[in-house]
Amino acid sequence: MSVGSLSSGARRSRQERTGNLLTTAQAATVARLALANVEREFPNKLDHVMAGTTDVAPPRALHPAFFGSFDWHSCVHAHWLLARILRLQADVVEAALIRGTLESHLSAANVAAEVEYFRRPESRTFERSYGWAWLLKLAAELGQWSDVDAQRWSRNLAPLAQAVAGAYLDWLPDATYPIRHGVHSNTAFALAFAHDYAGSCAATALGELVVAKAREWYLGDIDAPARWEPSGADFFSPTLIEADLMRRILDPSEFPDWLARFLPGIERREPRTLFSPAVVSNRSDPYIVHLDGLNLSRAWCWRAIAGALPRDDRRATIATAAADAHRAAGMIGVASGEYVGDHWLATFAVLALTT
């Protein structure tokens, strides 16, 4: 799937002002991918601790809302993708199918079953923290939307979102150290999406804890070792995902100075590894294809960083160029025909295009 060209300069200007670079054709493509994925039960990689033989069950029985898309977190964020496209581009051809899918999957009964599963003693660390973050992101997306259907889905999802928010409140005080890997367990990513949820859904206690933990873990970081990136299975840049968190946490007047200490080489485009898209040698390999996701997540991080800097800050222009280069590279891998990437990369593409 290529980035494609926008229909006119005027349209591009409007989209850039609103933060939405997603074209109608791209919206249709990723919507079709997500619609197919959320209904595809197999293959499936369960994160399922069994206390006995009675816990043996297929994905649809365990997770009636989020049984598809290969794994639970990918299914959750595919629903976020569908909700976001419907909110931003209500006239997308697949709109009726999207509404029907969200109505069916996000029923009160389905969500109640997900809550019951989440509260099992054996599920204490189920999908911590990547799946938790995406569930809160879905809740935040629905919660900010005035659409009548979306308001109903938001109410239905609220018990699960509240359970996840409660799990954050239980976990974070015990978490002495951050997790800085460029994969699912990254705590900067977990805090970023929890912060978004707390702000849009009035979860004051969670928001305060997230801010406190982000400052404890990341405020003093200097001269990030980004020259060591990427690792071979990264789909996040540990460096940029941290900066994407801190631009949320810090006052707008604080962030530019923090960024100068954290990444002092931006104006020199150093380290080069952070400005050069990753090479993806084999899109049929489930770990190597993570690097397509890395390019897309770097794109949304660089774009968000640029937006958090003053307009006359030279680093904003450099960050925007880096975002454009990574987005172009990452979009090549979306809809490749390889399910190891197709079950999740569309979501990263939508974030890169609409952040």
For every predicted segment, state its role.
Residues 50-57, 110-111, 165-169, 218, ...:
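Active-site-adjacent bridging/hinge elements
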Residues 28-52, 94-104, 150-163, 198-215, ...:
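An acidic intrinsically disordered interaction segment
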Residues 3-6, 11-67:
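Low-complexity, Ser/Thr/Pro/Gly-enriched N-terminal "stalk/linker" regions
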Residues 32-35, 39, 43, 64-68, ...:
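HEAT/HEAT-like alpha-solenoid repeats
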Residues 16-22, 79-92, 133-149, 190-202, ...:
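Well-ordered alpha-helical scaffold segments within catalytic/enzyme domains
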Residues 19-24, 60-76, 116-132, 174-187, ...:
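Solvent-exposed loop and edge beta-strand segments that line ligand/cofactor-binding
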Residues 201-338:
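Long, repeat-rich segments with strong aromatic
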Residues 76, 85-198:
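Extended ligand-binding groove/face enriched in aromatic
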